[in-house]
A protein has these predicted regions:
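A short catalytic or substrate-binding loop motif that flags glycine-/basic-rich loops and adjacent residues
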Residues: 103, 115-117
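Short beta-strand segments that buttress and anchor functional surface loops
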Residues: 109-115
Length: 124
């Protein structure tokens, strides 16, 4: 499917495409995923949320880094219990961003792989 805002997308539990995005001064390959069924196309709210995400990426990068550091600080005992010491010098290596999820209502979430568990972490 080709969308006027997202471009070429494939269906895999929502319409998806891969995109390289700079976050926290690093380049990451993100899956951009639209919360839809196969019969639906991205909504105007999802298109606007994506455009806003791209436009405000520097602010999102700064804000999400603070949230990630807070999350890691609040969960340090669990992380140490799973990984032991020493922890990586760069604590953001413990949470690797891998997906931007755009909900039908226009909300956006960044999903991370967590180094100490098989579960994902979400920051809205």
């Amino acid at each position: 499917m080709k969308d006027k805002v997202f471009g070429e997308m494939q269906f895999n539990v929502g319409w998806c495409k891969m995109e390289t995005i700079s976050l926290w001064g690093n380049l990451y390959t993100f899956k951009i995923r639209i919360s839809t069924t196969k019969d639906e196309v991205p909504s105007e709210k999802q298109q606007q949320a994506y455009l806003s995400f791209k436009k405000n990426l520097n602010e999102i990068s700064e804000k999400s880094l603070g949230l990630v550091n807070d999350f890691l600080s609040n969960n340090i005992d669990e992380i140490l219990g799973e990984l032991g010491e020493p922890l990586p010098t760069n604590l953001t290596d413990l949470l690797i961003p891998n997906q931007v999820l755009l909900f039908k209502n226009g909300k956006t979430a960044i999903i991370f792989d967590a180094a100490w568990t098989d579960e994902n972490v979400v920051i809205l």
